[in-house]
Amino acid sequence: MDLKAKLREVPDFPKEGINFIDITTVLQDPEALKECIDSMKKKVESFGEFDIIVGAESRGFIFGAPLAYALGKGFVPIRKKGKLPYKTISVEYELEYGTDILEMHIDAIKKGQRVVIVDDLLATGGTTKSNIKLVEQLGGEILGIVYFVELTFLNGREKLKGYNVESIVQY
């Protein structure tokens, strides 16, 4: 199945000049969603033995939790500041206009655990770099990173040099 053909491109969203890649068309199609998860699962399995999957709010949850289930692993959510109920570690990262803070529970990753990060889209790599910092602060080892969509023209892989990065659909 051509998953790229199943995606919808929305011009000038969220602002003029941006060509937004809408994943909801894949999520709504049971066969496309299954193909997407199965394809991501193969990429994750190619990294070798690992312990846990991490996904960032919110679309990382969409792919990370079903992958964790399919692979018999746990799932760790990374959330925006103030959304997790227990003690957290945090990292500030830059957005196009300003900064934001991501958090993870202090007991979410055990020292030495092998971690796979899952997200919907690789653009500049900034959010993923923040995820990596959180995992590594707790002593986790990043085994690999899997995205559904990669915007290659934004060169996000450059920020992630030294990490095993895979994607299903490339623009």
From Swiss-Prot:
Molecular-function GO terms, alphabetical: adenine binding; adenine phosphoribosyltransferase activity; AMP binding
Lineage start: Bacteria, Bacillati, Bacillota, Clostridia, Eubacteriales
Biological-process GO terms, alphabetical: adenine salvage; AMP salvage; purine ribonucleoside salvage
Family assignment from sequence similarity: Belongs to the purine/pyrimidine phosphoribosyltransferase family.
Domain of life: Bacteria
CDD domains the UniProt entry points to: PRTases_typeI
Function text: Catalyzes a salvage reaction resulting in the formation of AMP, that is energically less costly than de novo synthesis.
Keyword annotations from UniProtKB, A to Z: Cytoplasm, Glycosyltransferase, Purine salvage, Transferase
Pathway: Purine metabolism; AMP biosynthesis via salvage pathway; AMP from adenine: step 1/1
Keyword Transferase listed: yes
GO CC list: cytoplasm
PANTHER family xref list: ADENINE PHOSPHORIBOSYLTRANSFERASE (PTHR32315:SF3)
UniProt-annotated location(s): Cytoplasm
Assembly, per entry: Homodimer.
Protein name per its UniProtKB record: Adenine phosphoribosyltransferase
Major place of residence: cytoplasm
